[in-house]
Each structure stands twice: as structure tokens, then as C-alpha cells.
Amino acid sequence: MNDQFKTQVNAKYAFYRTHYVNNDDKLIEVDNLYKQREVYVSTANMYTIFPFWDVSMSYDFQWNEMKADMYGFVFPTRFTTLLSIATALRLGKVKLQGSGLATFVNDQVKEGPAPKARQILTPAVFLSYKPFDKHDFSLRAFYKKTFRMPTFNDLYYADMGNSKLDPEYVTQYNLGIVYQKQWGNKLFRHFKIQADGYYNYVKDKIIAYPKGQQFRWTMLNLGKVKIRGVDISTETMINPWKDLFITMKVQYTYQKAQDYTDPSDNYYKDQIPYIPWHSGSAIAQASYKGWDLNYSFIYVGERYNQQENIKYNYTQPWYTSDISLSKEFKMKFGSLKASLEVNNLLSQDYDVILNYPMPKRNYRASLTVEL
């Protein structure tokens, strides 16, 4: 287009096939085949009114269809339309962004009553302020509303889906700081630290937890959930000698996610299922002439596997280490990347979800071609 007007168009088609078979004679035998199709198109346009002021508009359309070979299946079809208008202002040390997203969702079924059509407008406002000229330090804040429709998996998978699920509405408040510094040809090349505190109010939060079989989960809405949390992350890069760069990242999250639906419930103000209070990760990467060596450590703290925070529902923390080595080769037709991964390096026993043991030490090799 030109320097003032820019546009982008995307399109996607996807097909998913899920075949679930359970021949355990102690349980109900199941042999279900699900097929899903998705078509997605979007266009985004941005116009620069002044060097300090941009406006944009985007339009998205998505079509989803689900079929299954079960008696009485409803064969749902969903039409989703998204229309967004946004603006961004840069006024000296202040950056201000605002947007409004209109969402229209229409579900149709071949059997039973038609689901209710949904129309919702969700605004967002973002603000950042950089108080110092000589230091890359900024304060940021945002207010945002979001809306999430239950997926077809949430609604219609047999003995898992809940066709009565309501959409999830979230109101988010966030305050944060960011500081970063760049150095030239020195040992330390880059350092960044950021911290955010947030409060989310969630109406009809959609959660899932297993009934005891791998494919069968309970889907339900929690009427009112309040989430308070802190995210802290740091990143640094060093260059000990020519062509060798070492990057280290550390991230920590504290999250208190409580169910405030009904004061008469035994689990009123309890932490909601499978949300840990503490979690974090550490990543180290060494890069040298196209070779990359990566190590990652993930920690998930204690949590509960049901709505009541009692000893019987307590779930132990878990942590794991992974390592990978990759090499990128430049070819005439593009590039070729070969990688080898060792996951769960210490071969530990752990469950992300109760009674769903994760693999012990395992290996994966891959080749990726880019044209």
C-alpha cells in the first residue's frame, strides 16, 4: 500500500479427527468418531493519521462444524464474527491505546433446541509511561474485558461436554513495571526485568477436571471467581567470547484464584481446581554458529484436584527438566533445522493431573525445512 496505510489478510483451514475407543469390559464400552472442520479468514487495516496517531480496524470470520457417529448427536455448526476498532497515541513519554471488540456468535444444531445467539462488546485500554530519558524504564497499566465461548469440545464430547455451559466473561486490571538495558561489545549484552500485579474478576469461569478416565472430564461453570496474582520475569544475555551467546530467563508466578460463587458452599473462597499458588520456570540457552543448546526447568507448586481444599484432594508439587540440541543448516532452497530433545531428563515420576502419569525420560528427534 503506502507508508500511511497498511493491510494484511490471513486465511486458515483445519480438519481434526478424533477416534476414541475404550474396550474395558469393566466400564461402558465406547467407540466414538468425531470430525471437526474450521475455516478462518481475517483482514487487518491500519492508517496513520499523524506520526503520533494510528487507527486500525480488523474483521475476522470463523466457521466451525462438528460431526460424530453417535445416535442423537446434535451436529453443531458455529458462525463467529469479530469486528475490532483500535487507536494508538504516542504523546511524548506517554503511550495510550484503546480498542473495542464486537463479537457475534451464532450456533446451530440439527437436533434439539437452538443455542442462544451471543453478541458482546469488550473494551480495552492500555497506558504506558516512560519517566526517564536516559533509562529504559516504564510503568504500564491496562483495563480489559474479554469474552470466551465454550468450544465444541467443551459442549459436545460424549460424557465430557456440557451443552449447558455458559460463556466466560473476564474483567482484568493490571499494573506493571519494565526495565531493560543494552550494552555494546561487552560481556553483558542485555538485561531485562518486568513485574506485573493483576486482579481478574471472572463470571461463569469454565473449568475442567477428569472423572478418572483419560478421555472423560467434567466441564462446568464457576459463577464467580476472583484471581489475584503477580508475575515476575528476568532475562539476561552474555557474550563470553566471539560467536558464543548465552541467554538466561527466570519467571515466577503467584496466583490466588478463589471461588466466590456461593457463601453456603463448603469450598467458598477455596482455590479452584488445578491452579497452583506458586509456579515458575528457568531457561538457559547457549548459541554458537548455528548450534543451540537449551535447558529448561519447570516447577508447579501444590494445588487441589477438586473444588474443596481438603487433604484428600491435595496434589503434590511437580518439577521437571528438559534439554535439547539443535543445528540450523543453510541450503540453496532455504534452511534445514535438525534437533534432538531429551524430556524429563531426570526420569521423574509426576502427574500434571491426578492419576495421569507423565512419561519418564523420553526422546524426540525432528527435522524442519523452511523454503
Describe the function of each predicted region.
Residues Y13-R17, F61-K67, L91-K93, A102-Q108, ...:
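Transmembrane beta-strands of outer-membrane beta-barrel pores
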Residues M1-D3, V41-Y47, L83-L89, V125-Y129, ...:
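Residues on the lipid-exposed face of transmembrane beta-strands in outer-membrane beta-barrel proteins
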Residues I28, F52-K134, Y143:
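Signature of Gram-negative outer-membrane beta-barrel scaffolds
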Residues K203, Y299-Q306, T315-Q316, D322-L371:
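C-terminal beta-signal and adjacent terminal beta-strands/loops
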Residues Q4, Q8-Y20, F132, S138-K144, ...:
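Membrane-embedded beta-barrel scaffold of Gram-negative outer-membrane proteins
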